[in-house]
C-alpha cells in the first residue's frame, strides 16, 4: 500500500510553535490533510515523550530534530520509546537543554551524533541565527551580515578587529527575539539561543523605578545604598534569558589614524585645460576646517554635471558665509549664487568637475549621487577626535540631525560615541502619496537624531554650537573605558520563516552589529554547505537520507553530485496544525501496512533502505522568500553576475542584494541535473487554502476561505484527495471557480512569480516573466561607452 508520510513537524515544546501542537491535534488534522503516518517531532522532550506513550499504537513514528555544535540541524527517526530513552540518557552529558527544549542542542558534531543514533538503531540525515539584514561594524566600514566574506575583519567584544573564518547560513522557522536598546533605532534581532554580550542588572535599592548603576546619584545621599553595581560583570547571556533593564555592552572603537593630506592628482589628470588645473591645489590638508566643510557637504551638498553645490535656506547666513570662506581657502573657488527670489532657498554652485569627481568618489557609497547614498570614507571613522567633532558640527549645523542615509547615520553615531555622547536616531518611514490615482512609492526612510550626553567633557563644546541638549540630566546609559553600557527597554518575539546567518571569528568568537555584540552561535540543507564543503565532511560517512527543505526540490538537489546517491525526503517542518502548514510537503512511501510507532519505523526504514519512496510532494521552490537573487529593499530581481557587478548593492534604491538559493545551488553544482534511476518524481503542491484564497480573493485565515475548505474536506475526507485525485466535475458542485483553479493546478497552469530578497513568491493565473534589473541607459553612460 502507498502511505502519505510527513516525518518532520514540531510540538508545542519547540520555540515558535503553536501551543495547540499536541499529539491529539497532530493526528486529527493530519487525517484531514490526508496523511497516513506522521512524525511525532520533539520525542526527546521528557513531558512530550510521556504524552506520546499514550498514543504508541497510533499512526505515528518517533522523530526529533537536534542541532549539533556546528549549528547543523539533523532529522532523526527512532525505532521505539525505549530507544528514545536510551538516546536521551546518552545525550544528557552533551546537552544542557534536552529536558526543556523540543529541539535540543548538543556539544558534539554530526559525525559523533550519527554514530550515537545508529548505535540505538535510528536513522539520521541533515534537516533544513541572525537575520540577513543585520548590519555589522567592519574595519573598513559597515556591511550587512549577508554580504560578509571570509577574511573580512569585524569588530569584536574585545574592541579589536578580527578575521571572519567562516560564514554560516541556514533557514530558520520559529520565534525570533527582538531586543530594543536605548539609544539605538535598530532592534537586535536574533534566535532565542544566541548569546549576547551583556550585564544582568539589579533594581535600585531605594525601590524606585530603574536599575542600580555606577552613575546613580542616590548612592551619595543614601547611606544604606548597597552599590550592587559593583558585582556587575560583562558576560555572554542567552538572548531568551535577557530581561528589560539588563544592559547591553557595546565596544567603542578607539583606534586613531590621522590623515594629513588628500591628493587630487587622479582628478586633475582628467582635466585638459591648464587654467582649470592651476586653480585647484594638487593636495589638500585634512584640517579641522576641511572636516567642517565635509560636514556641510554631507548635510547640504550635492553633485551636478559640472561641479558641486550647497542648497541652503536664506536664514542660514552663518553657514553660507562659512562655506564660502572654506571653499575659497581650501580650493580657491568662489560660488555662483542662485537666488531667484521665488523661494526661501539659496544655492551656492561651484563649477569644477575636479571637485564633482572628488566629492562624488569620497562622500557617496553607490553609483547614484543622492542623499540616501551619502557616507564618509571608512578612513574618516578613525580620524582624531578634534577633526571628527568638526565633521559632526558641520553636519549638525546644516541638517539639525536629519539624514536619509542609513550608512551615514550609523557612521555619525559611531563618531559621536568616540566623542563622548550619542546621537539617538528615530526612524520615520514616509507615507506613499498619490498623484491622481497613481501611488508614488518612496523607498527612503528619514532618520532624525537627538543628542544624549554620556561624558561631561563634551557638554560645553556642544552648547557653544547651540545644539539642543536634554532638559533633564537623566543618563540611562553610561560610557566606561571604551564601552557603552545601554539598557534594554523592550523585548518582543516574532514568528520568522527565512534564512539566518552567523560568523565564526578568529580568537574572540564574537562580532558587533550596529546595535549589539553577539557571540558565535548558528544553520537549511544549504546551511550544511555553509558549514562544510561536503556532506561527508559533516558525517564522515553517508547519512541515511537528505531532507530537501522548503526551498528545494529534487531537480535542485540533484544538481549537486554528492547527493545523487542518497534518498530524498520532503517534509513540512510544521510548527502549527493548520492545513496550509502540516503536510504542505510529504512523501508517498510504499509500506506493507500501517501500525503503531515501532511497526511504522520498520516500514519507513525498509522503504528508505530499499528505494520504496514512490514520490516527493512539496511546495514549488519559487514560492520561497529567497529563491532568486534580489534586493532586500525594493525586491528587484538580479542575475548573479549583475549582483556581483554592483558589489551586492542595489543601484536602484541602495538596498542590499541577497543571493538566492537557486544561485547558491548553481555554485555548488556541476552544471547538470542528473537523477539516479531510483529517484522518484517530485510533484509541486499548492495548499488547498491558498488556492481558495487566490480564487475568491480573500485572506487565507478568513471565514470565507475556511468555510469552503471545510466543505471540500467534508465531502472528500482529506485535502490530498481533493488536490490530487478528486473528479473536477464533482469538485465543481461545491465551487466551480475553485474547481477550475484546481484543474489548472493539475495541468501546471497556475503560475508563480519567484520570490527573492525576503519577498515570498506569488501565485497567479497568468504566466509570469521575471523582471530582471536592467541598467538605465543615460546620456552620460551612453557617451562613456
From Swiss-Prot:
UniProt KW Transmembrane keyword: no
GO molecular function: endonuclease activity
Species assigned in the record: Methanocaldococcus jannaschii (strain ATCC 43067 / DSM 2661 / JAL-1 / JCM 10045 / NBRC 100440)
PROSITE patterns found in the cross-reference section: INTEIN_C_TER, INTEIN_ENDONUCLEASE, INTEIN_N_TER
Name under which the protein is recorded: Uncharacterized protein MJ0043
Gene3D superfamilies in UniProt: Hedgehog/Intein (Hint) domain, Homing endonucleases
Alphabetized UniProt keyword annotations: Autocatalytic cleavage, Protein splicing
Gene Ontology biological process terms, A to Z: intein-mediated protein splicing
Record's keyword annotation contains Cell inner membrane: no
Coiled coil ranges: none
PTM annotation: This protein undergoes a protein self splicing that involves a post-translational excision of the intervening region (intein) followed by peptide ligation.
Domain DOD-type homing endonuclease stretches: 293-421
Amino acid at each position: 500500500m502507498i502511505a502519505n508520510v510527513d516525518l518532520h513537524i514540531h510540538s508545542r515544546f519547540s520555540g515558535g510553535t503553536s501551543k495547540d501542537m499536541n499529539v491529539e491535534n497532530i493526528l486529527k488534522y493530519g487525517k484531514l490533510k490526508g496523511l497516513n503516518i506522521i512524525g511525532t517531532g520533539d520525542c526527546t522532550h521528557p513531558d512530550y515523550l510521556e504524552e506520546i506513550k499514550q498514543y504508541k499504537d497510533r499512526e505515528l513514528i518517533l522523530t526529533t530534530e537536534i542541532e549539533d555544535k556546528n549549528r547543523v540541524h539533523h532529522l532523526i527517526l527512532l525505532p521505539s520509546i525505549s530507544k528514545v530513552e536510551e538516546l536521551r540518557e546518552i545525550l544528557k552529558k552533551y546537552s544542557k537543554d534536552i529536558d526543556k527544549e523540543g529541539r535540543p542542542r548538543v556539544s558534539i558534531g554530526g559525525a559523533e551524533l550519527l554514530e550515537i543514533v545508529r548505535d540505538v538503531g535510528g536513522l539520521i540525515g541533515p534537516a533544513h541565527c541572525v537575520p540577513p539584514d543585520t548590519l555589522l561594524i567592519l574595519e573598513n566600514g559597515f556591511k550587512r551580515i549577508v554580504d560578509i566574506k571570509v577574511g573580512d575583519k569585524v569588530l569584536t567584544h574585545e574592541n579589536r578587529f578580527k578575521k571572519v573564518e567562516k560564514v554560516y547560513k541556514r533557514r530558520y522557522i520559529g520565534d525570533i527575539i527582538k531586543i530594543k536598546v536605548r539609544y539605538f533605532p535598530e532592534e537586535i534581532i536574533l534566535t532565542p539561543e544566541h548569546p549576547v554580550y551583556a550585564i544582568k542588572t539589579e533594581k535600585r535599592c531605594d525601590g524606585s523605578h530603574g536599575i542600580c548603576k555606577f552613575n546613580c546619584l542616590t548612592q551619595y545621599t543614601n547611606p544604606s545604598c548597597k552599590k550592587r553595581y559593583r558585582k556587575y560583570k560583562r558576560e555572554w547571556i542567552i538572548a531568551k534569558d535577557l530581561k528589560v533593564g539588563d544592559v547591553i555592552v557595546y565596544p567603542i572603537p578607539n583606534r586613531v589614524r590621522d590623515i594629513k593630506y588628500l591628493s587630487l592628482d587622479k582628478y586633475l589628470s582628467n582635466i585638459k585645460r591648464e587654467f582649470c588645473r592651476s586653480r585647484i591645489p594638487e593636495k589638500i590638508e585634512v584640517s579641522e576646517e576641511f572636516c567642517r566643510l565635509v560636514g556641510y557637504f554631507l548635510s547640504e551638498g550635492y553633485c551636478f554635471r559640472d561641479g558641486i553645490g550647497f542648497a541652503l535656506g536664506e536664514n542660514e547666513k552663518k553657514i553660507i558665509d562659512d562655506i564660502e570662506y572654506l571653499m575659497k581657502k581650501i580650493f580657491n573657488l568662489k560660488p555662483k549664487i542662485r537666488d531667484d527670489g521665488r523661494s526661501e532657498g539659496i544655492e551656492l554652485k561651484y563649477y569644477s568637475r575636479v571637485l564633482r569627481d572628488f566629492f562624488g568618489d569620497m562622500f557617496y557609497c553607490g553609483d547614484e549621487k543622492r542623499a540616501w547614498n551619502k557616507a564618509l570614507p571608512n578612513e574618516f571613522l578613525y580620524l582624531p577626535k578634534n577633526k571628527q567633532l568638526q565633521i559632526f558640527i558641520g553636519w549638525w549645523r546644516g541638517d539639525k540631525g536629519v539624514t536619509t542615509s542609513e550608512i551615514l547615520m550609523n557612521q555619525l553615531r559611531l563618531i559621536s560615541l568616540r566623542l563622548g555622547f550619542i546621537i539617538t536616531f528615530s526612524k520615520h518611514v514616509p507615507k506613499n502619496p498619490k498623484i491622481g490615482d497613481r501611488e508614488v512609492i518612496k523607498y527612503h526612510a528619514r532618520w532624525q537624531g537627538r543628542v544624549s550626553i554620556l561624558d561631561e567633557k563634551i557638554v560645553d563644546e556642544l552648547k557653544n554650537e547651540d545644539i539642543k541638549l536634554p532638559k533633564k540630566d537623566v543618563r540611562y546609559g553610561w560610557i566606561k573605558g571604551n564601552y557603552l553600557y545601554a539598557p534594554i527597554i523592550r523585548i518582543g518575539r516574532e514568528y520568522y520563516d527565512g534564512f539566518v546567518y552567523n560568523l565564526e571569528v578568529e580568537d574572540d568568537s564574537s562580532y558587533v552589529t550596529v546595535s549589539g555584540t553577539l557571540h558565535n552561535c548558528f544553520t537549511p540543507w544549504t546551511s550544511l554547505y555553509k558549514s562544510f564543503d561536503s556532506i561527508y565532511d559533516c558525517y564522515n560517512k553517508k547519512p541515511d537520507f537528505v531532507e530537501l527543505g522548503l526551498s528545494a526540490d529534487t531537480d535542485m538537489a540533484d544538481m549537486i553530485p554528492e547527493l545523487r546517491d542518497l534518498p530524498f525526503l520532503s517534509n513540512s517542518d510544521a510548527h502549527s496544525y493548520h492545513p496550509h502548514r502540516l503536510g504542505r510537503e510529504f512523501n508517498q512511501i510504499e509500506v506493507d501496512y500501517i501500525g503503531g510507532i515501532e511497526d511504522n519505523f520498520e516500514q519507513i526504514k525498509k522503504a528508505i533502505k530499499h528505494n520504496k519512496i514512490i514520490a516527493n510532494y512539496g511546495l514549488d521552490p519559487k514560492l520561497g522568500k529567497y529563491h532568486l537573487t534580489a534586493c532586500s529593499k525594493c525586491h528587484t530581481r538580479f542575475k548573479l553576475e549583475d549582483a556581483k557587478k554592483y558589489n551586492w548593492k542595489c543601484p536602484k534604491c541602495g538596498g542590499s542584494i541577497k543571493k538566492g538559493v537557486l544561485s547558491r545551488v548553481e555554485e555548488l553544482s556541476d552544471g547538470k541535473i542528473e537523477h539516479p534511476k531510483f529517484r522518484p518524481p517530485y510533484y509541486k503542491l499548492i495548499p488547498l487554502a491558498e488556492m481558495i484564497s487566490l480564487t475568491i480573493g480573500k485572506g487565507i485565515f478568513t471565514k470565507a476561505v475556511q468555510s469552503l475548505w471545510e466543505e471540500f474536506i467534508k465531502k472528500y475526507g482529506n485535502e490530498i484527495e481533493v488536490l490530487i485525485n478528486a473528479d473536477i466535475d464533482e469538485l465543481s458542485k461545491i465551487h466551480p471557480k475553485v474547481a477550475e483553479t484546481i484543474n489548472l493546478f493539475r495541468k501546471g497552469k497556475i503560475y508563480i512569480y519567484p520570490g527573492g530578497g525576503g519577498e515570498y513568491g506569488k501565485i497567479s493565473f497568468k504566466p509570469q516573466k521575471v523582471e530582471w534589473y536592467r541598467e538605465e541607459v543615460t546620456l552620460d553612460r551612453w557617451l562613456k561607452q
